[in-house]
Amino acid sequence: MKIYNTASKNKETFKTINNKKLIKMYVCGPTVYDHAHLGHGRTYVAFDIIRRYLEHKNYIVQLIINFTDIDDKIINRANEQGTTIKELSDKFINSFLEDMEKLNVKPALIYPRVSEHINEIIEFIKVLEKKGYAYATADGVYFDTSKYEKYGELRKINIKEETSEQKNININKKNQRDFALWKFAKPDEPKWDSPWGEGRPAWHIECSAMSLKYLGDNFDIHGGGCDLIFPHHENEKAQSECYTDKKWVNYWIHTGFVMVNNEKMSKSLGNFSTLKDLFEKYSAELIRFFLLERHYSSPLDYTEDAINHSKNNLDKLYNTIQNITVAFRNSEIKYKLNEIDKNTIETIHNCTEKFYTAMDDNFNTAQALKYVFEVSTAINKYINNYANSDELPNYSIILKSYEFFKMVGEIFGIFGSSTINTATNTNIAEENLINILMELRADLKKEKNYNLSDKIRDKLKEMDIILEDSPKGTIWKKA
């Protein structure tokens, strides 16, 4: 399996720490001053699929997603709304978790809050200061980037050129590239005691301290949106490797932007759609499917046409699953395979291998999805081949297709509204009742009691059970 590592700008063969089956993953969480938008959704759906695939390959994934609940934006929004920082943060943390649940994003192991890790942050800064990497000024404590030779490595920037272009000069800094670790308190802001004076943590130090506490001084995967590469992840990397004197993260993974009219979707530009707004127009599963149709690192254009295109694709797959469900009840075990049986089995086998190859190639969901549709086409053709035949489909082939779609659903986190997890939306008692009603309807038709037989058909339709008559008899399926 290969993963594109932002640090090396190359795909690298994935190896866990000490080749163990445990994977430690830290994904930067939201700053909780507003509802999550589609860009957030993309990041956490992408890492959820990465996690699901790793778990499918029998890894144990320890996922940490933090909440930044101390920030200028939160302070300003709380003042605007006349509420406390705690109340505002709690509101939007709960909102975020609700959105993730709807998107079928599996919960993280821990969701640490910055406000609950002040002591760890202070201790982290004290170590940096003791080692000579941090210095106090009139307005806070800063990290000295000149002491870290690898600064700029993640973004691949020329520090001297970038520094010379700096426009906002802070006279308190030794170097304009230096960044804050601790900010001294301003009136009416949250503050904590520290060796340097009352204040609050700066942004970048938060994730370094919390990841150290929960994942240790070296972990497998650190991720987030590509807008975090610089300055956030660059600064995290600098302070963490100076703290630990070793490589901090083995693989850096970043998701691409969601674009609207060729601009990044963001709150600062005001061109964003919250997930809650989108859920009023589309199903959460459709949003998730829309997000996975493109590779996680590619820009994703959000338009209504694109969403509708995704809906058509998802509907096609649901139709296939419905056909498989019906075929389960109308197939038979055969010990000899005919030519179409052999071709269909070969297609399912080959596409399964190609699906895994695509996912092993930097979690390429877009490529993997092509093979899902290839199986969909093949199994529909196979089932339709028997529609007007006296023979029934081979049960083992229907089972193979069912297992394929079940695997895809588990990895992609989709098909939750389908029959794929149980092969039927009905329990055994309901299925038996439907079969009894179908037999009764058949008897009524033989007696030419069409009014009553049609009434049974119509009543079942009201219950979302569709009856389809064919030369081989009547079959039923969910609407």
From Swiss-Prot:
GO terms for cellular component: cytoplasm. Its EC number is 6.1.1.16. It is an enzyme of class 6 (ligase). GO terms for molecular function: ATP binding; cysteine-tRNA ligase activity; zinc ion binding. A motif ('HIGH' region) lies at residues 30-40. Zn(2+) binds at C28, C207, H232, E236. One of its GO terms (biological process) is cysteinyl-tRNA aminoacylation. It is found in: Cytoplasm. ATP binds at K267. Binds 1 zinc ion per subunit. It catalyses: tRNA(Cys) + L-cysteine + ATP = L-cysteinyl-tRNA(Cys) + AMP + diphosphate. Keywords: Aminoacyl-tRNA synthetase, ATP-binding, Cytoplasm, Ligase, Metal-binding, Nucleotide-binding, Protein biosynthesis, Zinc. HAMAP family: Cys_tRNA_synth. This is Cysteine--tRNA ligase. The lineage of its organism: Archaea, Methanobacteriati, Methanobacteriota, Methanomada group, Methanococci.
